[in-house]
Amino acid sequence: YDPVLPSALRQSSARKPLPASLPRQTRVIRPEEECCPVCGGELSSLGCDVSEQLELISSTFKVIETQRPKLACCRCDHIVQAPVPSKPIVRSYAGPGLLVHVITGKYADHLALYRQSEIYRRQGVDLSRATLGRWTGAVAELLEPLYDILRQYVLMPGKVHADNIPVPVQEPGSGKTRIARLWVYVRDDRNADSEMPTAVWFAYSPDRKGIYPQNYLAGYSG
């Protein structure tokens, strides 16, 4: 049974145009005939039919090899060499784009690290779950200054919305799960015609004890 929806709730069946911002690749398929197949006459242009097809180009790995030539002075033997480029994680071969992909997959797309490891293996690169976990921890440390600034902004004097979310957490070694908490603090003053950007700050606690929000809100007034 398929009830008839009111016209206001019906979704339009018209196909939306593909975003103009997407990169485009043009292929021209010309007729095989160089002259009219009926009479042999010369062919002239009569316009062109255009159609579009949306395609997905899968992410691919590449190795960026950095070479730093060493130059020696012929007079005093002084050696000149460019400095080593900085890396997101010291002594790691993970590039910034790869780290962004791992973190976005885990926290924005809810793609567990072991699943990401399987995906990368199908692409020909063996990245273990342990390796991805170490990278995730290292990126978390890199983002701590941004995390602190976000907390300061959200908990400025004024109105703050707060809530907590139950989160299942697996206990290491036991295979059992327990319920932890994510405390959510939101600054959103759009209803008061404020032009300040909205922001959300999350804090984790292993349980729901009140001592945690008390510590998070220490120094806050509003």
Briefly describe each language-model feature range.
Residues 61-113, 186-199:
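Active-site-adjacent "gating/activation" loops or surface patches in catalytic cores
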Residues 1-93, 161-162:
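Short, flexible loop/hinge motifs at secondary-structure junctions
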Residues 15-19, 52-56, 82, 96-100, ...:
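General secondary-structure edge motif
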Residues 41-42, 48, 96, 174-176, ...:
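Intrinsically disordered, low-complexity regions
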